[in-house]
Regions:
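Pre-recognition alpha-helix immediately N-terminal to the DNA-recognition helix
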Residues: 18, 29, 45-48, 107, ...
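Short, locally clustered residues in the helix-turn-helix/winged-helix DNA-binding domain
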Residues: 20, 48-52, 140
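Residues within helix-turn-helix
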Residues: 58-59, 70, 77, 97
């Protein structure tokens, strides 16, 4: 992206700007690959969080995904309509809604794995094994920095 420096607020030469651009491109490519198997970006993370087949509360799912409860509620509504998850009130506490991946959703596991393998391959094309390892190490450090731990 070519933005004149005088109009860029001085941010276009920062690493954070580069990360933002890469993140945007990566998410777009993930959306494209997942749409080929009938999913939307983010739904694969829900599948991962529910992969063991057990049910969890919506609050626990939000915590696992690192998102707000309201975000999960909206996402689950459409996923339930698509037959990917089921939701039921907890019999011991009617205030709690339990979520479970349906067999239809769990059956997509291999296709999700393949889509992510393809995304990973495309993302790191042209990098040597050492560069991939170095990138992974650096991204872990950046993630740790942003998590504030």
């Amino acid at each position: 992206m070519n933005i004149p420096q005088r109009r860029s607020l001085g941010i276009v030469n920062t690493l954070s700007y580069q990360v933002a651009l890469v993140t945007k491109s990566h998410r777009k490519r993930a959306e494209d690959l997942l749409s080929e198997i009938g999913l939307h970006a983010g739904q694969e993370m829900t599948l991962l969080a529910l992969w063991d087949g057990s049910d969890v509360s919506q609050s626990e799912l939000a915590a696992r995904l690192g998102v707000q409860k309201a975000t999960v509620t909206v996402a689950l509504r459409s996923m339930e309509r698509e037959g990917l998850v089921s939701r039921e009130k907890d019999p011991d506490d009617q205030r709690v809604t339990r979520v479970r991946a349906t067999p239809k959703f769990l059956a997509l596991g291999e296709e999700v794995r393949n889509a992510w393998a393809r995304l990973d391959s495309e993302t790191t094309a042209g990098l040597s094994d050492d560069e991939r390892k170095q990138l992974s190490t650096l991204l872990e450090k950046v993630a740790d920095n942003l998590q504030g731990d």
